[in-house]
Amino acid sequence: MGVPTGRVDTVVLIHGLWMTSRSWEHWVDRYAARGFRVLTPAWPGMDVDVERLREDPTPIAAQRIAGIVDHYTAIIRGLPRPPIIMGHSFGGLIAQLLLDRGLGAAVVGLHPAPVKGVLKLPLSTLRSGFAILRNPANRHRAVPFTREDFRYSFGNTISPEYSDASWERYAVPAAGHVFFEGAFANLDPTSATAVNTKRSDRAPLLVTAGSEDHVVPASLASSCANLYRGSTAVTSYREFPGRSHFVGGEPGWEEEADFALEWAVEAANEYSPTVVSTAPRR
């Protein structure tokens, strides 16, 4: 397992839709035990308990992709060294947008929502987001995420009892506007999810997937990774058999967590940036 070096000693973990920073609790403990400083900043205004967000989801409804990216940009530029950036699901999309801004020593998209340009939209992805997409008015709402929704989207490889307990601990309503931004990016000429996939001066990128993922099926994740093949910068892809979208708590999560960290440490040490990027924001 990789350990901190003089070049990289911090990992920034970015949660996705339907989740908060609490979803990283197991990864934080595992990475911290290896000597890393692990940061799990929430989306803007969402740095409160799951229970409070369920009672008052106003901060969720206000989310916009551009604002989320600006929020993490400020955090990362304030660090003394470029960190490893990892994001899950829509957090993986945010990680790719940060990569496009020249940030990070290495970036990992864990079952990431795709950037603009990926044309594939699998039926299971649509089903996972149906509670949001079925009503255009949800674009301006925080949309509830039920136990049944969680079972299909996150708990499809675990028992109903464990899925329900995980829903109780982790799940929050989804930011409808963010989901609509991602789902219809290819129809929006000014989409906030657009990146320059051909740039070669970026940090290394790893995209991971799970063979049983309903939200971001492996076919969608691999299509996202393939967009970057026109760049000479490092782009890697890894699919984990039997894994769902629940990377934070599915039994065996340690395998993906360890692989992601090992890959990122090695890639970051080879990339070896010396300062946090001051590249202009897109």
Which role fits each region the language model picked out?
Residues 214-223:
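Conserved alpha/beta-hydrolase "acid-adjacent" motif
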Residues 16-19, 89, 211:
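Active-site glycine-rich loops that stabilize anionic/oxyanionic intermediates
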Residues 66-83:
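Conserved acidic catalytic loop of the alpha/beta-hydrolase fold
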Residues 104-139, 180-187:
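Flexible "cap/lid" loop of the alpha/beta hydrolase fold
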Residues 86-91, 95:
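Gly/Ala-rich beta-loop-alpha elbow adjacent to hydrolase catalytic centers
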Residues 231-282:
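Catalytic active-site module of serine/aspartate enzymes centered on a nucleophile-bearing elbow/loop
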Residues 32-54:
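Conserved alpha/beta-hydrolase
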Residues 201, 207-209, 213:
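Short beta-strand/loop motif that positions the catalytic acidic residue
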